[in-house]
């Protein structure tokens, strides 16, 4: 019988990533875990609908036995079974992030007994989670280099707070892994600005694009008008394609915040990325830790290791026999596996 791993949900950044990573790793390794103080670092601690959906999804996919799977719970015991491929559908029932639920269960399905399709309904454009286009255009091409083949499709947008979006991912079991080396970003090839609108006047998008174009030389400027019933909502994105990597940054518009202010937030984030020679942005760094650990080798550079990144590494090291090495050099942090 495998040992029970005890986790403190208040460690590090104290958010939902500790739980999501633990669920992924438990399904992959077969190691049970207990976690207390779930989301202790948040204003509203305990399991929200998004986190509960992730727990239920993990439970269904591997036939786990669970204690504490209810809204508001700050303690969970998870004993995994065998991961099985298949066609799965999960509904969050709020504008909680579809991609964060997918992020929880897809790594386990890389090791399933056959191909799978997972569809999640909920929020797709959430200020605190990566949108589907980030997964599709940034993360999945890097996963393919590692040997992980999955394809995400955004079927319907769902903006916060209404939700109603749908995202689906098809995934195949991994045949073999390759090592990912992302030490250098390389020269910038092109930059693309994009605005999504649903039930919001077009002049908002035009002002946001103008703000981006005032700071960067954009090779493409795209405005996409979505059906009104998918809103109201507005997302501004800027994609930076470099020789070795494509990064994508986004900001979700808010009521009573001007188009210029929304776009200026994105400009500042992209400028921070470009000010460092690091290959990987802060949010992508979080996404690369688990697949790199499963490979057991590889490296990437990031400008600064976030608390989120350090917390994720700490959880991964509890489940897998790997140790990460972080070395600051020439204004970047090089993250590798010893």
Swiss-Prot record:
The active site is at 308 (tele-amp-histidine intermediate). GO terms for cellular component: cytoplasm. Its EC number is 6.5.1.4. It is found in: Cytoplasm. It catalyses: a 3'-end 3'-phospho-ribonucleotide-RNA + ATP = a 3'-end 2',3'-cyclophospho-ribonucleotide-RNA + AMP + diphosphate. ATP binds at residues 103, 283-287. GO terms for molecular function: ATP binding; RNA-3'-phosphate cyclase activity. It comes from the Bacteria. GO terms for biological process: RNA processing. Keywords: ATP-binding, Cytoplasm, Ligase, Nucleotide-binding. Its main location: cytoplasm. The keyword Cytoplasm applies. Pfam families: RTC (PF01137), RTC_insert (PF05189). Catalyzes the conversion of 3'-phosphate to a 2',3'-cyclic phosphodiester at the end of RNA. The mechanism of action of the enzyme occurs in 3 steps: (A) adenylation of the enzyme by ATP; (B) transfer of adenylate to an RNA-N3'P to produce RNA-N3'PP5'A; (C) and attack of the adjacent 2'-hydroxyl on the 3'-phosphorus in the diester linkage to produce the cyclic end product. The biological role of this enzyme is unknown but it is likely to function in some aspects of cellular RNA processing. Belongs to the RNA 3'-terminal cyclase family. Type 1 subfamily. PANTHER family: RNA 3' TERMINAL PHOSPHATE CYCLASE, RNA 3'-TERMINAL PHOSPHATE CYCLASE. This is RNA 3'-terminal phosphate cyclase. It comes from Escherichia fergusonii (strain ATCC 35469 / DSM 13698 / CCUG 18766 / IAM 14443 / JCM 21226 / LMG 7866 / NBRC 102419 / NCTC 12128 / CDC 0568-73).
């Amino acid at each position: 019988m495998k040992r029970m791993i005890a986790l403190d949900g208040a460690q590090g950044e104290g958010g939902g990533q500790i739980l999501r990573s633990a669920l992924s790793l438990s399904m992959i390794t077969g190691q049970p875990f207990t976690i207390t103080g779930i989301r202790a670092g948040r204003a509203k601690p305990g399991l929200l609908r998004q986190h509960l959906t992730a727990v239920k999804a993990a439970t269904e996919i591997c036939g786990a036995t669970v204690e504490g799977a209810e809204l508001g719970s700050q303690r969970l015991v998870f004993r995994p079974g065998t991961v099985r491929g298949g066609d799965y559908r999960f509904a969050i029932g709020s504008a909680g992030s579809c991609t964060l639920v997918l992020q929880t269960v897809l790594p386990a399905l890389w090791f399933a007994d056959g191909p799978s399709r997972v569809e999640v309904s909920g929020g797709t454009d959430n200020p605190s989670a990566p949108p589907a286009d980030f997964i599709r255009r940034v993360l999945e091409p890097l996963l393919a280099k590692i040997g992980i083949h999955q394809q995400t499709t955004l079927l319907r947008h769902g903006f916060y707070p209404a939700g109603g979006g749908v995202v689906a991912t098809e995934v195949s079991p991994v045949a073999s892994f390759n090592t990912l080396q992302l030490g250098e970003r390389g020269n910038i090839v092109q930059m693309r600005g994009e605005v999504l609108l649903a039930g919001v006047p077009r002049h908002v998008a035009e002002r946001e694009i103008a703000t981006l174009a005032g700071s960067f030389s954009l090779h493409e400027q795209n405005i996409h008008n979505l059906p009104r019933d998918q809103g109201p909502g507005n997302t501004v994105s800027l994609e930076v394609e470099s020789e070795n990597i494509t990064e994508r940054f986004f900001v979700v518009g808010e009521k009573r915040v001007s188009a210029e202010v929304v776009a200026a937030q994105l400009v500042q984030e992209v400028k921070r990325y470009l000010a460092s020679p690091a290959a990987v942005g802060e949010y992508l760094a979080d996404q690369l830790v688990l697949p790199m650990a499963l490979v057991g080798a590889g490296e990437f550079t990031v400008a600064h290791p976030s608390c989120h990144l350090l917390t994720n590494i700490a959880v991964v090291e509890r489940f897998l026999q790997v140790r990460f090495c972080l070395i600051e050099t020439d204004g970047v942090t090089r993250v590798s596996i010893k």
